[in-house]
């Protein structure tokens, strides 16, 4: 599941960097992951810059994810732990969008690494991204309250790590 989250974060960050003209971007999101036996729903907000991302999950549990290029820090409040990770296999999203096809004025499809992505637009803004992940889960991410180029304090991209949390590397 963590790999699914990380691929999505990198995907959305690169999507906005390549497809929309902006320096920073923020949005609220809901993410629904459906497997054969269950459906999980997540919500929160994210802030992106060209090289960094901050994701805050509010439900079902509080979690923050900080991405700086290919370095990832995940603060898991329910587990009182912080996970440091390095992404070696980041999808080549330039290739995804070179191969993307406009199905109609509000829908794009792209295939990369045997994963098909559907991107739905509304008035040239991304409304949702859906795909089937490597575990055969159906993933739908809906965006709302999108803001292009908000002023962002760079401190938002620095992980806030409580002293009593366990560190996992």
UniProtKB/Swiss-Prot annotation:
GO terms for cellular component: periplasmic space. It is found in: Periplasm. It comes from the Bacteria. The keyword Transport applies. InterPro entries: LolA/LolB/LppX, OM_lipoprot_carrier_LolA-like. GO terms for biological process: protein transport. Keywords: Chaperone, Periplasm, Protein transport, Signal, Transport. Its main location: periplasm. The keyword Amino-acid biosynthesis does not apply. CDD domains: LolA. Residues 1-17 form the signal peptide. Participates in the translocation of lipoproteins from the inner membrane to the outer membrane. Only forms a complex with a lipoprotein if the residue after the N-terminal Cys is not an aspartate (The Asp acts as a targeting signal to indicate that the lipoprotein should stay in the inner membrane). Belongs to the LolA family. Monomer. This is Outer-membrane lipoprotein carrier protein. The gene is lolA.
């Amino acid at each position: 599941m963590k790999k699914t989250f990380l691929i999505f974060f990198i995907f959305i960050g690169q999507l906005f960097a390549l497809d929309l003209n902006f320096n920073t971007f923020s949005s609220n999101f809901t993410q629904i992951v459906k497997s054969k036996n269950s459906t999980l729903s997540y919500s929160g907000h994210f802030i992106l810059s060209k090289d960094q991302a901050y994701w805050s999950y509010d439900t079902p549990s509080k979690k923050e994810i900080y991405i700086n290029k290919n370095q990832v820090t995940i603060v898991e409040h329910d587990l009182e732990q912080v996970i440091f990770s390095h992404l070696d296999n980041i999808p080549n999203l330039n290739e995804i969008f070179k191969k993307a096809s406009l199905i109609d004025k509000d829908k794009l499809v792209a295939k990369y690494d045997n994963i098909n992505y559907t991107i739905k637009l509304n008035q040239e803004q991304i409304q949702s991204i859906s795909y089937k992940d490597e575990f055969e889960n159906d993933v739908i991410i809906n965006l709302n309250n999108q803001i292009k180029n908000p002023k962002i304090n760079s401190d938002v991209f620095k992980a806030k790590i409580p002293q009593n949390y366990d560190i996992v590397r």
